[in-house]
Amino acid sequence: MRNKAVALISGGLDSVLAARVVMEQGYEVTGLYFTSPFSKSYGSEELTPAVTVSRSIGTDLRVMDLGQPYIDLIRSPKHGYGKNINPCIDCKIHMLERAKVVMDEIGAPFVVTGEVLGQRPMSQRRDTLHIIERDAGLKGLILRPLSAALLPPTRAEQDGLIARDKLLGISGRSRTVQLQLAERFGIQGFSTPAGGCLLTDKNFAEKLRDLFHDQETITPHDIQLLTVGRHFRFDNGVKIVLGRNNRENHILMALAARGYHLFMPHGFPGPVALFSGTPDPEVMQAIGRLIITYSKQAPGQVRRIRFGSEIFDPGDPLPIQSMGLKKIGTKH
């Protein structure tokens, strides 16, 4: 029976290379790909790079949703945030805790990651790598094949389960060695570095901070809504989301079935608005004016708004601030 190992597979080059290097030593690798509402591909039916690269090296892949506990972690991470609202250290610890469960389940002696010493300023420093494996309950059990020659031997190396002289000593941000290895192993379809996490995006981070401030309980649906449209908030805390194009309008209309109120332009092209709260007359008028402000209809023409079975004239558009509204996010 072949020895088994568990590997975190992100879809990027480093993680699949790490798995492939371990496979060179005769291990059967089970890949783990974690999804969350903070992944740009979350909910997509298309093949992710993680699926593509796993197939290219011939390893099985388990897709695991990080779920509600991960959302709660993002709100208050023990080790803080990176440049935006990305808690990279806590994120890696959480994934490794989940990986440890699978490791124990299949009887694997270690977990493989594609971490490279010094590649990322927050989560891949020498001291941080130690903190991550300690807090994940995996001290001595995380094998980092790409940088192993520069790190203390793991338990697997000490016990002779892995040949240390066949592991690599890569460090820093250069990817020359990795690209050479990818060509050697015939690996294609990998994603760009750090390209799939919404938490590193400044615009998304501002919207998420606003949501954390406003709501105690946050669901994956709330997170997905942050990726769509222009976001505004009334002085009283109520939020509105406006579609920016036809695709986003259809997404917002689908979300309306989940307890949101939907306002639509009646008889003219323009954005739809999603709203949660009590639609009193003043709020309805402001939402209608906001829709008109962002519509392409020529000024002076009569424009009405549909809310359920009601059709009303909100009046002429006004400046955003004078309607008691604040823009949320950096892209409008």
Go through each PLM region and give its residues.
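ATP-dependent adenylation/nucleotidyltransferase module used to activate substrates
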Residues: 1-184, 328-332
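AMP-forming adenylation/ATP pyrophosphatase catalytic core
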Residues: 141-332
